[in-house]
């Protein structure tokens, strides 16, 4: 662009003029009217111009308002500052009018001509006083000959490019020759536009569609140096070319320009009619107006195709428009054209009916498209909908149409004439989709126009799969759908490689050769490539990376310290303190990796190692159960903990899997969050017969009546729901009794006393002399706000009652001392000496003691439903007994309370205190019984009753044992039919059941399970059924550990912990072993094979750990990188010399490829000599 083009026209009076109506002028004050008549701001800034009509009115005296209201409003709408362009009646101005018009741009000229009354005195005066101005920039007729695509609007005030307006999405809508070039008119601007690649593409597109356009624009395409030369004009020079005004895409007035017959199109006239070539170019706009009418004007500039835009903007494809003819073809509609996507938040805002409607519509669209076209890969959205998984995407831009284009638009495909025949054959050789192949040579650029000059924001061209990569990287393979790349060496050795690698999970783009090069030089990939399959007759060996003993010894200190931090839920800042403590004992600790960031990274690899082992055991388990525990952490973030109950060999395990934050606390929100978390962890929960139980905590959303169980049963029909999560049962019971007035008062009084002593160390020390247990409990419950119900803690109530006499005497002494503190103590002493309060605390101890055995039974790892039922039955009996007679603690109170005194201290007893106590006591007991019935008995599936048949203590003896439990076994087998072998025989199952009863009588349930599972050859059907029964979640020990761990980790001081770090810490704290039993070597090896350990380039070999055979094979590395099995040798491998101990972790030079690398025969890594 010429430098002068960016300049701006001088400011004129019309640019800053404000016209008022008569009614508006009357409202102004005299000072405001005088200010309106001042012309001191504009006159000194430029050359002298004609005195405007407005100031002449001020000079003559009449009021300067405008004429009629309608005429005034019409005038204001045509003002140059408004949206619409002014009207110029005639371009061929004669005489003095043309002379005066040369000093103004077309907009100004049009405006002044509209103001004139026919006498022309304004323009004449203007021209007479402004003869020194430069020659104006006006529209020249020769431009229409030089630029065949140039057209004008009806008012003759703006220029347009007919080719670019035909394809508005190709060019930025804000381009001047698309919106309307209104001046200052320069031929350089037209030349610059003619040379632009977007314009050239539009010209080629029109030429490819219509041969008449091709003939007219042949001169533009053929000579690449001068694309503007044209042998003949497209339009006549005698008449201007008209184009409908208005915003881009507004074709309402196009009908006025269209002729009534085809003959008019073929016979261009010379009387100012529209040329046939132009009308043929726009003949299909009416159909486009109908099809695109449902879209708003803002949607008109949506790109027809991402690949087309990138082809235009790609600098590497400059010659494309000159050499390659463009062919337009209507590609078949694909699913992406009619798909609508939602983000996670937007999906959560939909109700159940809207989600079901969305699922039905998407499935119907896919089925319709599948019936109309050839078979194609099933879209990921449809797969998610069929699995009833959450269909939201992670794109934060919200709902979108497929890949960014609305349905029904045409795709434009550019192909070379010379390669037309060979393209079909080459496309079969390219391991990528056709769309990706077309987009491979393209890039995109986005033009943005801000307050200043135009800025161009360029984006990189889209990356596609290249054929040359498969020759450059022999290990590179592609999936059948041709959308993902994999490393064939790494996917065959998943235990050696980090599964988070993109080329192990599936590389889906953006495809870059740098990613492949980076993967090729990684330690994990080289280890996988340098291993070969052992001969089929030799036992399989486990290959592990060989790390120097010095490196392993140094890193063990860091990983042990990091594991201790995570296991005990300590702050991450304590990591450096632990290392300093180790160093003070004489342990050699490296100077690096001593900060919080390094500790977080080590915990990450520790947790990933634990998770990998757990998930592998879960996938190998014959059946599993899912346990859900909803909670709200210290940051008030609602989340759901997911646990898995599974078999590890012959042992039942419960492990924490993840803590998923909830975006919506509804049944749909829970379901989609849980399904997404399980899918992300690659847990095959949809496999028929694999998931047998669903344990919930009984909350409103997770219960059977909440709808979540029904949603899971749609995916897993045989799922057995169990309300099993019962951690802190006593807290839940007191919470259920929270509506009772006496319970709330009791809890409030205890909190008041505790806060009174916590606020003063002096009073706390005085209390310690006679009430040591209470003083210790007050110190332990330092943060009372974190305790929901203090009255639910048996330990707190017991300490309060034991220390009650000393507490009352101390409060009496403080009250006698007087003052403000004494007044507070006097009020608390009155509460502590209340008969109602003291006796109800004794009753609460008896009440909570009944729930303790039931809570302990529910926290066992292996427990039979009969044991839970027996404990539950005893709890019902104890509660009924407590309802009618006093418990042990209450009897103790009755025995000690004599003559209105308890332990020598007088109690304030009201006349109706005993009656109120008995009423509240019975109400509390009934509420507790109702809670247990709702918690354990409501909606209880009959299969749990059938499982009681495995309680050997309830088996009959003699002949009755032969037919005992047959119906229960058959009912269980029919319900869990998917978990048993296909076509099993019920007679064979009953025979196995009879055999088990003869050998396992009087055995406890745990021994019965181990015997049945160990003898799976003898009991092939019954062992599988027994595994299902054991997997049903009855106990909740893992949920209890996870609940406590989360409260220790995310406290009020650590509310900003991310969910990723929280999951890492909980994975280690819940699933980890004791610190003294932890082996850090697997985590160190995992760290060593990832990017964090890549800086340590030690001798890169792999040590073989034989599985069965004691003989170890040697691996030899040849020049080409291939390995083969070699006979054992006695020659020792070359070992790199070691430097000083402080330089152990520095990079070492790798052995040359022609050298042989041998692993050591021993399990221990070689030391650095």
Swiss-Prot record:
Localisation per UniProt entry: Nucleus
Cystines in this chain: none
Keyword Repeat carried by entry: yes
Pfam families with a match to the protein in the record: Dimer_Tnp_hAT, KRAB
BP term (GO), one: regulation of DNA-templated transcription
Record has Repeat as a keyword: yes
KRAB domain: residues covered: 11-77, 333-404
A GO MF label: protein dimerization activity
One Gene Ontology term, aspect cellular component: nucleus
SUPFAM superfamilies: KRAB domain (Kruppel-associated box), Ribonuclease H-like
Broad class of the protein's primary localization: nucleus
Key words of the record: Disease variant, Metal-binding, Nucleus, Repeat, Transcription, Transcription regulation, Zinc, Zinc-finger
Chain positions of all zinc fingers (TTF-type): 135-218, 461-544
Job description of the protein: May be involved in transcriptional regulation.
Disease: Fibromatosis, gingival, 6: An autosomal dominant form of hereditary gingival fibromatosis, a rare condition characterized by a slow, progressive overgrowth of the gingiva. The excess gingival tissue can cover part of or the entire crown, and can result in diastemas, teeth displacement, or retention of primary or impacted teeth. GINGF6 is characterized by gingival overgrowth beginning in the first decade of life.
Protein name (database record): Zinc finger protein 862
Origin species: Homo sapiens
UniProt lineage: Eukaryota, Metazoa, Chordata, Craniata, Vertebrata
